[in-house]
Amino acid sequence: MAEVTFAKLYKNVVEDFRGDIFIEYFENGNKVQWSKEKFMQITDSLSAYFAERLKNVKKGTWVGICCDNSPYWVSIFFALEKCGYCVAMLNCSFTAEQVNSFSKNLGIEAVIEDNYERAEKLDVKELIMTDDLKKVSVNSEYNTSDEYWETKTAFVTSGTTSNSKLYVFSAESITEQIYYITAQKHAYDKMYGDKIHRFLQILPLRHCLGFGTAMALWVFGYTAFFPDNIGVLTIIDTIRKADINYMVGVPAIWKAIFSVVRIKTKSKVITEQSFRAVMGDSLLSGICSGAKAEETLIRDFRNLSLEIINGWGMTETGIAMVGFFSDNTSYNYTGKILKGSDYKVAFEDENGNISESGTGELLINGNCLYSAVLTEEGLVPRKDEWFHTGDIFENIDADYYFKGRCKSVIITDSGENLYPEELEESFCEILSDVPQFCIACYQNCPVLFIYAPEAEKTVLEEKIRCQNQELMPDKRIAGVFISENPLPVTTKGESSRFKLAEFFESNKKYFNTIILQKGKLNL
């Protein structure tokens, strides 16, 4: 049987699109519309352009897309896959050093770029700017058969050069995931599916959540609207002006919207009336996922007629669970495993026992997971074994309830997984003379705990602040807690990471606290 290529996803999403307008956006204040036919013409033209421009780049190798969302992003993706290149979706917030690191380890010889300053520092054979692609004449036709379409792509998690990770997915896996998402009849009916016409594309298409939800919404026949930027005021203005019915966002985006509603209506409580006064009447439904939604945010949703989908997934697993906040009264309810998918789910308790029900760390296996991960030794295929998600869930009659994170993982408000051990490496050099230091989770934020009786506190604070600013925003610690007394340790003599929050709460008067990010910690 022939291997599934991205031609199948292209057919399902684009060729079989049943709506009238595929993409919309504002340009110089005027609305621009792309029909399905125009989108396909642009994709074919870019395919012809890439076939000539990348003729010295071997087919079957990797090409990086390192650019922000734009109406052209998806055309670029499909055009490259159509030409026989595997697309690596790089984080557009990466530095040139990070892009070069991935290019070297993955063998990337060409990069599609939209940042001229970063582009000057890239070390690749072919560098193509998105501004040049927008000038490609839309009259070329690139004929290809399925044998030239590629079979894989890769999502890259954000982070520093040392800890960013790249996961490869097969075209078959992604196509199946999109199919199972769109096959949820209950979800379609509950989200007012037949009344939705236009969704706002604000999540990065390079991310599995942004990519997967956009593809699924196109399968439903909805128009994707690309805003000028993703500032909260622009989002609100676009929802009103462009008649947006659906929006996918992480909790931080929804919280920002509700904050504006509260300010503009001078009301602490979100009501249907106050929400519509600011947002208008067009928004009917949406998704709030990518991170755990706080109880206050869920209460705000429940005060509205909006039907908001919760859910769960990771870069490594794609979208695995789907559920509505209104389906269950529990604030910890996450949803059900995607029906029909190839996911196998189990739990591992604190003693290492694995079972199919109960409470414990969520384990997942199946073809819907990533197929390979990039290491310093190159791409390493995933073994057919349980993948440890780092999340604790309880399974009650196939309903999944989020109970917390595994001890070593911190999840940020924007949905990023932070690994304390990796963060500590960033501070090792400047804290080499400190007797004890450890990064732990406090109020869902990474905090640096220190015991340094002999250190000059002012100098130490300045070093930490400078080092923290060197990290990407989602990787920065929220504060520093300097203790007058030794930190608790394990039987191995190591700082007891999982007792630090409790230790701080019981001994606050012996701590000097330094806030590094305003609004993150409530002290």
PLM regions and their residue ranges:
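Conserved AMP-binding/adenylation subdomain of ANL enzymes
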Residues: 175-198, 205-274
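Conserved C-terminal "lid"/linker of ANL adenylate-forming enzymes
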Residues: 394, 410, 438-441, 466-523
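Gly/Ser/Thr-rich phosphate-binding loop
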Residues: 245-249, 258-330
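Conserved AMP-binding A3 loop
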Residues: 33-36, 152-179
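Conserved ATP-binding/catalytic segment of the ANL
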Residues: 361-417, 441
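Conserved pre-ATP/AMP-binding loop-to-beta segment of ANL
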Residues: 19-21, 135-156, 162-163, 189-198
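Conserved AMP-binding/adenylate-forming
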Residues: 32, 49-94, 201-202
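Conserved ATP-binding loop and adjacent catalytic segment of the adenylate-forming AMP-binding
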Residues: 225-227, 297-360, 364, 369-372, ...
